Amino acid sequence: MKRIFLLIATNMAILLVASIVMSILGVNTSTMSGLLVFAAIFGFGGAFISLAISKWMAKKTMGCEVITNPRDNTERWLVETVARQAEQAGIKMPEVAIYQSQEFNAFATGPSKNNSLVAVSSGLLYGMNHDEIEAVLAHEVSHVANGDMVTLTLIQGVVNTFVIFAARVVAGIINNFVASNDEEGEGLGMFAYMAVVFVLDMLFGILASIIVAYFSRIREFKADEGGARLAGKEKMIAALDRLKQGPETGAMPASMSALGINGKKSMAELMMSHPPLDKRIAALRAS
């Protein structure tokens, strides 16, 4: 799975920096190849920087306490369960952490399959039974084993590149149109041009978010299938059913919630990073 705000803020910062650098360097939007190179550098660069610092960012933003020496039987069981599932999935043991939140949630993050973090909320850890928690952990381990962190980063890089490129191409067309109808042929001017680019960044960014959310929902179904293989289908179904009874989600930043077990509800399913729980349960029962 706050994640939506963090993701939007990160991407807006990337787009703003891209605009400033392009203006300073005098990148000509009519030169498609040059613009595309800049768009790709900032689009993929920002996405991969986010991936590289994802574990550090998750620990800081969520206040994750990594379990190095289990303090009680619950923590010991948690670490042992993740270790067993990681071995089954053929990945290196992730770091295991707990963060304080009453919501029933968990997430996986990290730059690679063999450098990852699996974290669970205190609400989930003490509000669900062992079978349900085992299934949740299996779901998160499956995210790691499926390489979903890198997959979603690549998708984010592509859509970032599209947003940067398309916004400036359209702004260039508008600028040329204004210049052709201006006696002095000056066009929009730098500040007006940047304002148009910013608005277009927002509009195309909404479309990009819908695309990323679509792929995220697909990965959720896959992680549910993987969780069912590692923990058992009935346990996975029971865990998803239990999530429906838990507190409303919303404390997790968007950069983590896409790889969480329980997504934030939205009136528009197109914008949801997770399919509705009923659909996920139905898909498991039909498999």
From Swiss-Prot:
The chain crosses the membrane at residues 4-24, 33-53, 154-174, 195-215. It is a multi-pass membrane protein. Zn(2+) binds at residues 139, 143, 220. GO terms for biological process: proteolysis. Binds 1 zinc ion per subunit. Its cofactor is Zn(2+). Belongs to the peptidase M48B family. This is Protease HtpX. It comes from Shewanella piezotolerans (strain WP3 / JCM 13877).
